[in-house]
């Protein structure tokens, strides 16, 4: 299966995907980041993967940004888009365009602890169980 991975930061989930891509029959066509300083871009480059950076500050709206993101993704003819630490909320335009093809990795057992700092919030709440959610974006 051909996929594009979207990242914003360290890329630890990206690295796990890279390390297991052959095992799960996944071809990573491109890694796209909205953050030019994302360490995940270095991980992608080390794995000899194509990368792209889209700076949100260059666009006057979230929809304009997502239109550019769609344009780049369309060049790769992918079947799957993986949000691996991607820290932007996708617009309805993007979600409807790729409905059923967007997989999100979230570091908590949703619906508990959406958003940032999930691990610390779980510790602060004295949770006895904590994990990860992987779900299709709707």
Model regions and ranges:
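N-terminal Rossmann-like dinucleotide-binding module
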Residues: 1-39
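Donor/substrate-binding cores of folate-linked one-carbon enzymes
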Residues: 20, 26, 84-138
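Conserved acidic residues
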Residues: 29, 79, 100
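N-terminal glycine-rich "phosphate-gripper" loop used for MgATP/nucleotide binding
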Residues: 33-34, 58, 62, 76-92
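Short, structured coil segments at secondary-structure junctions
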Residues: 47-48, 98
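Short beta->alpha connector loops at strand-helix junctions that form conserved
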Residues: 52-57, 105
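Charged helix-capping and loop-helix junction motifs
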Residues: 64-72
């Amino acid at each position: 299966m051909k996929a594009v991975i979207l990242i914003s930061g360290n890329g630890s989930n990206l690295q796990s995907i890279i390390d297991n891509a052959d095992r799960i029959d996944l071809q990573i066509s491109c890694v796209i980041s909205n953050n030019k300083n994302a360490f995940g871009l270095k991980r992608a480059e080390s794995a000899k993967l194509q990368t792209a950076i889209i700076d949100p500050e260059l666009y006057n709206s979230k929809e304009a940004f997502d239109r550019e993101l769609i344009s780049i993704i369309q060049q790769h003819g992918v079947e799957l888009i993986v949000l691996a630490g991607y820290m932007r909320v996708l617009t309805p335009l993007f979600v409807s365009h790729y409905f059923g093809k967007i997989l999100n990795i979230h570091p908590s057992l949703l619906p508990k602890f959406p958003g940032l700092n999930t691990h610390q919030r779980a510790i602060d709440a004295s949770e006895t169980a904590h994990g990860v959610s992987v779900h299709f974006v709707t």
